[in-house]
Swiss-Prot record:
Enzyme class: oxidoreductase
Gene: GPX6
Protein name, entry field: Probable phospholipid hydroperoxide glutathione peroxidase 6, mitochondrial
EC code(s) of this entry: 1.11.1.12
Free-text tissue specificity from the UniProt record: Expressed at a low but detectable level in leaves, stems, and flowers, but at a higher level in siliques and even higher in roots. Predominantly expressed in seeds.
Organism, as annotated: Arabidopsis thaliana
Length: 232
């Protein structure tokens, strides 16, 4: 038995045919392995640029979003009572009092009367009132823009601009009012509570103060004078 095993081993080592077959098999396996190498290399080459490009786009988009954010009241355009665009940058250098008005409110008479008095006294010093009709509080401003302007100008001699009717709260709130509220929040949150809420804006378009609907216009005269630089 031992002799048979030794003889077989000797034949395998010395037989030219067996050595040739073994060498051919080994060479074929090596070639198959070598031919697979470029596949792995090509995968490594094309996988690198993808995430880098994505990162650059993300930074660019973030930069564009940041640059488009409004920085002052002058970045907004609104509609006047006739539907024409008004770029609020025309009020640069003026002190502004922005009010959401209504024609059928319990605060209508006192506010419209005092607004007219305040405007008459300081319009020559660079003071302007911007009135925005709003029907969100008790449906107390139901009329058309034309009716609202006629009411304010005829009954209260309003000479300041009255703009297009807007929403001041909710998803449909005018962008300018979203800016005003975010700049100066109220006592119980940012939302406008009623008709005749007031925002005071300085000569640079910054919102510097906010007053409740029940605050009378003449009671904030000292604040207006301070921003105007009027001492008398």
């Amino acid at each position: 038995m031992l002799r048979s095993s030794i003889r077989l081993l000797y034949i395998r080592r010395t037989s030219p045919l067996l050595r040739s077959l073994s060498s051919s098999s080994s060479s074929s396996s090596s070639k198959r392995f070598d031919s697979a190498k470029p596949l792995f290399n090509s995968h490594r080459i094309i996988s690198l640029p993808i995430s880098t490009t994505g990162a650059k786009l993300s930074r660019s988009e973030h930069s564009m979003a940041a640059s488009s954010e409004p920085k002052s009241l002058y970045d907004f355009t609104v509609k006047d009572a006739k539907g024409n665009d008004v770029d609020l940058s025309i009020y640069k250098g003026k002190v502004l009092l922005i009010v959401n008005v209504a024609s059928q409110c319990g605060l209508t008479n006192s506010n419209y009367t005092e607004l007219a008095q305040l405007y008459e006294k300081y319009k020559g010093h660079g003071f302007e009132i911007l009135a925005f009709p709003c029907n969100q509080f008790g449906n107390q401003e139901p009329g058309t823009n034309e009716e609202i302007v006629q009411f304010a100008c005829t009954r209260f001699k309003a000479e300041y601009p009255i703009f297009d009717k807007v929403d001041v709260n909710g998803d449909k709130a005018a962008p300018v009012y979203k800016f005003l509220k975010s700049s100066k929040g109220g006592l119980f949150g940012d939302g406008i509570k009623w008709n005749f809420a007031k925002f005071l804006v300085d000569k640079d378009g910054n919102v510097v103060d906010r007053f409740a609907p029940t605050t009378s216009p003449l009671s904030i005269e000292k604040d207006v004078k301070k921003l105007l630089g009027v001492t008398a």
